[in-house]
């Protein structure tokens, strides 16, 4: 079972009574056929549920009102099968607070050249019915997605699936609770921000709990529970000699297991799905949570270090979006560079907390090494390299008057040399279009040093996320040129200042 099983998407057909009962029966039959086919053949993440035809203002308003109050409804897919006068939709769309996708399709793929008549034309009017619906959306400044294509087309299936993932993530974020163990790393700017504004804009709440509250739960974990989790470690990872039974760091592994179980219990009891820690606030914990955080991220929790609640929330959102897709998604940080003409590289990592969902190794290495930051005992961690291929890194920042999402398209590459003295998980990539352009654009746009790294999601996913939440997006990819990028930032400043 995945999070998508908790939701459904309503399929709504727009028409009108002008065409008579016979035509409306045909419309209903077509809709039933299309919904059944999409549910069985399109590999959609959510089930489509066909609703009654929308043929009058009252019917349409009732559907939209019911969608708002149904917790299982993640959004609406609307198909204008015939012409549906758009003034009928005004009241419904004005109250709708769920995501909306217009599926610009028609029942037949090919025109029946020899038999086409006006009955056929009146029945299959998506071509101009969809435009009428589009006008009222533009007139009302109603943000909605549009997918054009035949309902049997796999590209259309893919795009609807991607939108469904966004719709579900939007419902999840409205319920998201972020737990901060301690506060921000002292004097750091980008990890701070306006939590009230974030809750108003996105819906997620951010609150702080004392590390001492967590320590109480950690200390209550039984040896039996720890032993069971250690057995899972043994079967899932390659343990270094120091971490095996009778190894001199075995107790550190047991303590890491205790911390993992304690954090998870705390999060479950509080209904949290994202959290932060900071190495400056570890009072009562014997080590910085490393292995614990890595494993919890792999289970779908959002996380970021140093109290960075925005990145923790973004990671949770992107984890939900990417559920069931190939490739992983992780907390990440641009750590250091390799400058080589024509082969500039970024080495991404963090002190410990990189999610093993992006690991290339089937069984990452579990080790315990010294960590100079934090002043605690040596922490356990998983060490691995990252899968190669196209990926993105994304950052959500608070500019005071708005949120900006930065996305850099990257190409992850194989590490050309062993890293025998680097005891942390890492990712190596080439930034698009090149490191100088990408880094300068990122810096000019105010991008954070913390990011969410993903092989599973792409730029289109993040564009759709920004549109659905009505926030700014700044893209750095192979089409980026600094003069144009700077102009876009200036235009965005003007646009959002006028908008708000």
From Swiss-Prot:
Listed GO molecular functions? L-arabinose isomerase activity; manganese ion binding
Record EC number:
5.3.1.4
Q: What class of enzyme is it?
A: isomerase
Q: How is its cofactor bound, per UniProt?
A: Binds 1 Mn(2+) ion per subunit.
Name the reaction it catalyses: beta-L-arabinopyranose = L-ribulose
| Pathway membership | Carbohydrate degradation; L-arabinose degradation via L-ribulose; D-xylulose 5-phosphate from L-arabinose (bacterial route): step 1/3
Domain of life of the native organism: Bacteria
Q: Keywords on this record?
A: Arabinose catabolism, Carbohydrate metabolism, Isomerase, Manganese, Metal-binding
Q: Which CDD domains match?
A: L-arabinose_isomerase
Q: Which residues bind Mn(2+)?
A: 306, 333, 350, 450
PANTHER family membership: L-ARABINOSE ISOMERASE
Q: How does it assemble?
A: Homohexamer.
NCBIfam families reported for this sequence? PRK02929.1
What is known about what this protein does? Catalyzes the conversion of L-arabinose to L-ribulose.
Q: What is this protein called?
A: L-arabinose isomerase
């Amino acid at each position: 079972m995945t999070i998508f099983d908790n939701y459904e998407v309503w399929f709504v057909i727009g028409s009108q009574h002008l065409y008579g009962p016979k035509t409306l029966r045909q419309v209903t039959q077509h809709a039933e056929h299309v919904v059944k086919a999409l549910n069985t053949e399109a590999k959609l993440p959510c089930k489509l549920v066909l609703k009654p035809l929308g043929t009058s203002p009252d019917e349409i308003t009732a559907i939209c009102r019911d969608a708002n109050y149904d917790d299982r409804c993640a959004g609406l897919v609307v198909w204008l099968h015939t012409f549906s006068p758009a003034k009928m939709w005004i009241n419904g769309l004005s109250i709708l607070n769920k995501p909306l996708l217009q599926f610009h399709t028609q029942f037949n793929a090919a025109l029946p050249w020899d038999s086409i008549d006006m009955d056929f034309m009146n029945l299959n009017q998506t071509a101009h019915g969809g435009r009428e619906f589009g006008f009222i959306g533009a007139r009302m400044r109603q943000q909605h997605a549009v997918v054009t294509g035949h309902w049997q087309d796999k590209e259309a299936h893919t795009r609807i699936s991607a939108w469904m993932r966004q719709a579900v993530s939007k419902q999840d974020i409205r319920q998201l609770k972020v737990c901060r163990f301690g506060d921000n790393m002292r004097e750091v700017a980008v990890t701070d921000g306006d939590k009230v504004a974030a809750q108003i804009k996105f819906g997620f709440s951010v609150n702080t709990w004392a590390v001492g509250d967590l320590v109480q739960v950690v200390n209550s974990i039984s040896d039996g529970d720890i032993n069971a989790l250690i057995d899972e470690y043994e079967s899932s990872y390659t343990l270094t000699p120091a971490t095996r039974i009778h190894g001199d760091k075995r107790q550190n592994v047991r303590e890491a297991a205790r911390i993992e179980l304690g954090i998870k219990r705390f999060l479950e009891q509080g209904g949290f799905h994202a959290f932060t820690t900071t190495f400056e606030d570890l009072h009562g914990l014997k080590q910085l949570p490393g292995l614990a955080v890595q494993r919890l991220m792999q289970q779908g929790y959002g996380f970021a270090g140093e109290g960075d609640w925005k990145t923790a929330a973004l990671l949770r959102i992107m984890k939900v979006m990417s559920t069931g897709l190939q490739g992983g998604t992780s907390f990440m940080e641009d750590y250091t560079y390799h400058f080589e003409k024509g082969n500039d590289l970024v080495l991404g990592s963090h002190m410990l907390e990189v999610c093993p969902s992006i690991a290339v190794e089937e069984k990452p290495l579990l080790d315990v090494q010294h960590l100079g930051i934090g002043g605690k005992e040596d922490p356990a961690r998983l060490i691995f390299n990252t899968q190669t291929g196209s990926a993105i890194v994304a950052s959500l920042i608070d500019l005071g008057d708005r949120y900006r999402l930065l996305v850099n398209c990257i190409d992850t590459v194989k590490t050309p040399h062993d890293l025998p003295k680097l005891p942390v998980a890492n990712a190596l990539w080439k930034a698009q279009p090149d490191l100088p352009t990408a880094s300068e654009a990122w810096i000019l746009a105010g991008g954070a040093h913390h990011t969410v790294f993903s092989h599973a999601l792409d730029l289109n996913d993040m564009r759709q996320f920004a549109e659905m939440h009505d926030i700014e997006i700044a893209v750095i990819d192979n089409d980026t040129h600094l003069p144009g990028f700077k102009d876009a930032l200036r235009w965005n400043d003007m646009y959002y200042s006028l908008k708000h």
